[in-house]
Design a protein with these regions (language model features):
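Charged helix-capping and loop-helix junction motifs
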Residues: 128-136, 164-167, 193-198
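Hydrophobic anchor at the beta1->P-loop junction of P-loop NTPases
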Residues: 12-13
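Switch II (G3) loop of P-loop NTPases
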Residues: 99-131
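N-terminal phosphate/diphosphate-binding loop that engages ATP/GTP or pyrophosphate donors
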Residues: 3-9, 23-94, 98, 103-107
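C-terminal lobe/tail of nucleotide-utilizing enzymes
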Residues: 2-3, 167-234
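Conserved glycine(s) of the Walker
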Residues: 19-20
Length: 234
C-alpha cells in the first residue's frame, strides 16, 4: 500500500509502549499533508504529563506542521501508567471508549484523514472499564466507520513475536492490519535487527511500509523529509 492513499480514520497502535507511535504518527501525518490532504491528529488518552506540558499529540502536530486547531487531546491522567490504572489511582472518571468513538467521528468530520494515536499496545486499558484499542476499533466499526490500522513495532530481538501477536489479536477481532512500521531504526543495526527487517512482514501478515530513523523525534525537518521519502518509495 501507499501510505498517502490512507483516508478516513486511521488508528496508529503499537506492540508496546515507547515503540515510536508518536513519531510515526507525525511522519504519516506529514506524508498525507504533503500529498494535499487535510489531516487532523487525535490522542484520546494521554498519561504521565502535567497539564501545562505538551502531550504526544502536540509533539506529533508540531513535527508534522499540522495546524494547532487540528491537534486534539481528549483526556490526561497524571501518572505514567496505562490510562485505566492512572485514572483509577487519581480517582478520575474519564470518557468511555463509546464516548470517544462518537467524539472522534464528530472531530473527523470535514477532514480527509484523521490519525488516532493509541496508548501502549492493543490490550492496554484506556477507559474506566478497561476497554482498549480493539474495543475502539469495534465501536467505530459499529458506527459505520471501519478504521484503517497501522501497527508500530520495534526493530530489536523479540519483535517478530510481539508483532505477530499484536496483528493476530487485531485480526481475531475482525479488523484488518493495513500496514506495519518500524518506529525507530538505528544507524548501525545489529544482526537480529537486519534479520527482523527481512522477516517482519511474514510475522505480521501485513506489509512493512516504513522504517523510521532513530532520533528524529525533535526535528520537524527530518520528520518531513522522512515523510517525503515514505511517499516516494512505495
Amino acid at each position: 500500500m501507499n501510505i498517502t492513499d490512507l483516508n478516513g480514520i486511521v488508528i496508529v497502535t503499537g506492540t508496546d509502549t515507547d515503540v515510536g507511535k508518536t513519531v510515526t504518527t507525525a511522519v504519516i501525518a506529514s506524508a498525507l499533508k504533503q500529498s494535499g490532504k487535510d489531516v487532523t491528529i487525535i490522542k484520546p488518552y494521554q498519561t504521565g504529563l502535567d497539564h501545562d506540558e505538551p502531550g504526544d499529540v502536540h509533539d506529533a502536530g508540531r513535527l508534522a506542521s499540522i495546524d494547532a486547531d487540528n491537534v486534539l487531546e481528549y483526556v490526561r491522567c497524571p501518572e505514567p501508567l496505562a490510562p485505566t490504572t492512572s485514572a483509577a489511582r487519581a480517582g478520575m472518571t474519564i470518557p468511555s471508549i463509546e464516548e470517544v468513538a462518537t467524539r472522534i467521528l464528530v472531530d473527523s468530520d470535514g477532514h480527509d484523514a484523521t490519525l488516532v494515536e493509541g496508548a501502549g499496545g492493543v490490550l492496554v486499558g484506556l477507559d474506566n472499564d478497561g476497554s482498549g484499542v480493539l474495543d475502539l476499533m469495534d465501536a467505530l466499526t459499529r458506527r459505520g466507520h471501519e478504521p484503517h490500522v497501522i501497527v508500530v513495532t520495534r526493530s530489536v530481538l523479540g519483535t517478530l513475536n510481539h508483532t505477530g501477536l499484536t496483528c493476530n489479536a487485531i485480526r481475531d477481532r475482525g479488523h484488518q492490519v493495513d500496514a506495519i512500521v518500524i518506529g525507530s531504526w538505528p544507524d548501525r543495526p545489529d544482526l537480529a535487527e537486519r534479520c527482523n527487517l527481512e522477516e517482519i512482514e511474514d510475522a505480521a501478515g501485513a506489509p512493512l511500509v516504513g522504517v523510521i530513523p532513530a532520533c528524529i523525534g525533535k526535528d520537524p525537518e527530518a520528520v518531513q523529509q522522512t515523510a517525503r521519502n515514505l511517499g516516494e518509495t512505495q
